[in-house]
Amino acid sequence: MDIFSIANQHIRFAVKLATAIVLALFVGFHFQLETPRWAVLTAAIVAAGPAFAAGGEPYSGAIRYRGFLRIIGTFIGCIAGLVIIIAMIRAPLLMILVCCIWAGFCTWISSLVRIENSYAWGLAGYTALIIVITIQPEPLLTPQFAVERCSEIVIGIVCAIMADLLFSPRSIKQEVDRELESLLVAQYQLMQLCIKHGDGEVVDKAWGDLVRRTTALQGMRSNLNMESSRWARANRRLKAINTLSLTLITQSCETYLIQNTRPELITDTFREFFDTPVETAQDVHKQLKRLRRVIAWTGERETPVTIYSWVAAATRYQLLKRGVISNTKINATEEEILQGEPEVKVESAERHHAMVNFWRTTLSCILGTLFWLWTGWTSGSGAMVMIAVVTSLAMRLPNPRMVAIDFIYGTLAALPLGLLYFLVIIPNTQQSMLLLCISLAVLGFFLGIEVQKRRLGSMGALASTINIIVLDNPMTFHFSQFLDSALGQIVGCVLAFTVILLVRDKSRDRTGRVLLNQFVSAAVSAMTTNVARRKENHLPALYQQLFLLMNKFPGDLPKFRLALTMIIAHQRLRDAPIPVNEDLSAFHRQMRRTADHVISARSDDKRRRYFGQLLEELEIYQEKLCIWQAPPQVTEPVHRLAGMLHKYQHALTDS
């Protein structure tokens, strides 16, 4: 009977959700809002959404941030809705079609921006559609409806935030501190594996896990930043630690790859040193102190460059880690580390995927419009709203089909649950605000527990039930209206699910190829003598792309190794002492243009032609390096890069 069990850790958030719903309900009726349902629905969604995503009680700041995004999305949607209505009030059908395109446009943008901010754009898309559909009988009331909707949503968000603060939300700071310690130990153990040069699959698993953990730590940093302004210093340090952690992974993996061709570079001194096992961050601290003494004794020239760079990055990591844990004032040494290179933002590789999402949302909304006009069903507008909601919110997630199924299950569960409230509970409690609040608190409490378990349909059931029960001012009980609303939700979700199934997303392979070509372009762009360009920090963006590649192609080790090799080539060439002269500078610009053409090529033939041109230019570039007497630190990584591109040219050019 575990399915009905209530764990202790789930109770606090369930009470928090119930409190948010009750507060929104009380305030909505107290201020005589026309539809307090919107305030209650907003409070429930803002509070429960982060809990469903986290699989438990969300950390401090998550609910506030989601509420902030909802306010932004609502205001953008309301303004867009007003503009569309004012411009096209004389052509109602065209007005609705433009709203469908607007919803698709917002979904397209939400597919390209950071996933944390995509919620606001998805909301902006279907908010405009809700306004246009709702004011169809009385278009002159549009400004009043937009203002009322914004007011009700702001009230719901404030109630959710108040409930969150009332029940002392969890701080993520202790989790961050523990992860910093554990991550440093894991970094040292990865370097041990790479120096031993053992089983490649074990090394692949180790660095893959570290990439995921570093990405997760970056997510924790975002949560900590949302939690309170007092963590501003810790946030700055964590941002630099992210780059240092990625540097440690890169240097470790390069140490492994170097031994494939030149194992003699790693001397017995370092092999014996890294044989000592470590279990805690304190062990790593002791080993790093000893390692710095060994390097001082052997000299920088006798130390492999990857080990020297790794030790330098690990030392800086340790220094910043202590600052994060104590949250003390940033000293001069730390400030020097934090004043690092500016991070580079890379263009999204998911443009084709975003266009698929645009068509899914637009076509599903147009299909809903045709269904509404053809049937003349009074709740066709409700079906359209659900179509827009499902497609706008589902498209940005890794598995839109499962999100649509979750909504279908939720709306089906909402029918009997809403029926119970509509026919029995609310008619018998509407005369008493206390009883009405208690009845909705019970609903919020039990669904809050299920939401934290990520039960299929729980989130959809919470929103759909609140949406169909009578929480208007004044309350009117028309069974046909209730049934229409409930069935409209179900039909809308089914239509959205149908469109998601019919409009297939085949962009995965294209996205993977674009990502790999972006790695190639980054490696080529590192060959420059421009001081400002050499100081740019590409590492976070490159590993963000690698993380996306790992999510798109789980278990595809050849792709991961190729991407990692390109990242290593980029880092090595970025620091290489390339001779400074106009001849090489002009050729660097030419190679960058060719690499950009490879990424932007529309057909396989063009892509192969430009890629072949890039390989030829790399051969010429190696000859130029010999003419200008470039040192081995330059010629060797360029030769390795050219060899890798020759070896994998089919994977990088074919669809």
From Swiss-Prot:
Top-rank taxon: Bacteria
Q: Which GO terms describe its molecular function?
A: transmembrane transporter activity
State the membrane topology. Answer: Multi-pass membrane protein
Q: What is its main location?
A: membrane
Membrane-crossing ranges are: 13-33, 38-58, 69-89, 93-113, 121-141, 152-172, 370-390, 407-427, 431-451, 459-479, 482-502
In the UniProt record, does the keyword Membrane occur? Answer: yes
- Biological process according to GO: carboxylic acid transport
- Family note: Belongs to the aromatic acid exporter ArAE (TC 2.A.85) family.
What NCBIfam families does this protein's entry cite? PRK10631.1
Identification of the protein by name? p-hydroxybenzoic acid efflux pump subunit AaeB
Instruction: Identify the species of origin.
Output: Escherichia coli O157:H7
Query: In the UniProt record, what gene is named as encoding this protein?
Result: aaeB
